[in-house]
């Protein structure tokens, strides 16, 4: 099963929002675990702020039976401890990597730049691409998969890290790039 974990700020809800000078302060932020195939929520936890997802996600994971699942989380959840928690509970993870992990991000970015210049017979990347139309846009996606992660200096910190995936998305709507 695929369990997607994501945080959302509920804009119309607040914790006594009228008493705050900053309109962003006091908004309700919820972390949810969603089973994609079944369309059901496994659970939700309140987070004081979006930045607190890093501490809220492990607490929620402790309450869930995720054994045998693939758990996906956006870049906020791309943390060594969260990856270890998922693996320790018998699941596998797919975590989005962005610049909140600057050293790992830079290593991955440099690797893909290098790998793309290698001759096809030496390439360590598997490549897939597809196009689709959605919401009035023409979308092109290229997916590159590297199953050799030995080049990552911090690979031992990331429990059972086995692949790095790069997704490049280009969109066009009415002749304009999106």
Segment roles from a protein language model:
Residues 92-97:
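Short hydrophobic alpha-helical runs that function as membrane-insertion/retention elements
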Residues 81-82, 103:
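Phosphate- and divalent-cation-binding pockets in alpha/beta enzyme and binding domains
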Residues 1-73, 78-81:
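Conserved, well-structured functional cores that handle cations and Mg-NTP chemistry
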Residues 98-178:
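An anionic, glycine-rich sequence signature occurring as long contiguous blocks
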């Amino acid at each position: 099963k695929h369990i997607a974990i994501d945080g959302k700020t509920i804009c119309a809800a607040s914790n006594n929002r009228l008493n705050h000078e900053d309109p962003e302060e006091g908004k309700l932020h919820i972390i949810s675990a969603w089973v994609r195939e079944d369309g059901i929520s496994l659970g939700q936890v309140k987070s004081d702020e979006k930045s607190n997802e890093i501490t809220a996600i492990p607490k929620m994971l402790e309450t869930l039976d995720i054994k045998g699942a693939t758990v996906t989380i956006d870049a906020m959840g791309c943390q060594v401890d969260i990856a270890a928690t998922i693996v320790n509970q018998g699941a596998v993870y797919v975590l989005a990597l962005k610049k909140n992990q600057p050293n790992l991000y830079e290593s991955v970015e440099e690797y893909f730049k290098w790998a793309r210049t290698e001759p096809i017979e030496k390439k360590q990347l598997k490549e897939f691409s597809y196009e689709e139309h959605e919401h009035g846009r023409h979308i092109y996606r290229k997916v590159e998969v590297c199953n050799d992660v030995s080049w990552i200096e911090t690979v031992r910190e990331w429990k059972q890290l086995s692949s790095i995936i790069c997704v490049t998305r280009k969109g066009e709507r009415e002749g304009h790039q999106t």
